[in-house]
Every structure is written in C-alpha cells, then in structure tokens.
Amino acid sequence: MPRSLKKGPFIDLHLLKKVEKAVESGDKKPIRTWSRRSTIFPTMIGLTIAVHNGRQHVPVFVADEMVGHKLGEFAPTRTYRGHAADKKAKKR
C-alpha cells in the first residue's frame, strides 16, 4: 500500500543531511547508510549510496529512473541458490 500523498515521501534526516553535504561539496565518495526505508529524492541523482543489506553495504548508483523508489529495493537481502536437485533424475 503506497504512502499517503498528504504525508509526502519519507527520508531519514541524517541521510538527507549527508546527501545535501555531498551535493554541496561535490564529493563522489559513497554515502554509507542503514536506512533502507528512505525514498530516493531527485537531489540524490548521480550519487553512490552504500545501502546495508544486513551483512554488508551494497553500493547503489542513483539514476533518474530510481526517483520515488526506496533504497532497500536496490540492495537484496536474500541470496537464491536454486532448488534442491532431484537425486533420482540426476543418476539417469
């Protein structure tokens, strides 16, 4: 269910401050964050944000198509290793 338009998009204030500081100084270093719930704003375009996936920080380069999505959508938390192979079919 999407967020109410009356409330507006959500972004953690500490992340917003880091983004504004990076844009102001022109710094291209990745911004580390644990805030997967924050919405991507247009001011973040062109920055690399390292989003925590529970184990490590995954670098995400923000493109203009990502605006409006959440940061957590681009840092998968689970690895899919495939279904278990059928041992009977393997012997044939």
Swiss-Prot record:
Keywords: Ribonucleoprotein, Ribosomal protein, RNA-binding, rRNA-binding. One of its GO terms (cellular component) is cytoplasm. InterPro entries: Ribosomal_uS19, Ribosomal_uS19_bac-type, Ribosomal_uS19_CS, Ribosomal_uS19_SF. GO terms for biological process: ribosomal small subunit assembly; translation. The keyword Cell inner membrane does not apply. GO terms for molecular function: rRNA binding; structural constituent of ribosome. Protein S19 forms a complex with S13 that binds strongly to the 16S ribosomal RNA. Belongs to the universal ribosomal protein uS19 family. HAMAP family: Ribosomal_uS19. This is Small ribosomal subunit protein uS19.
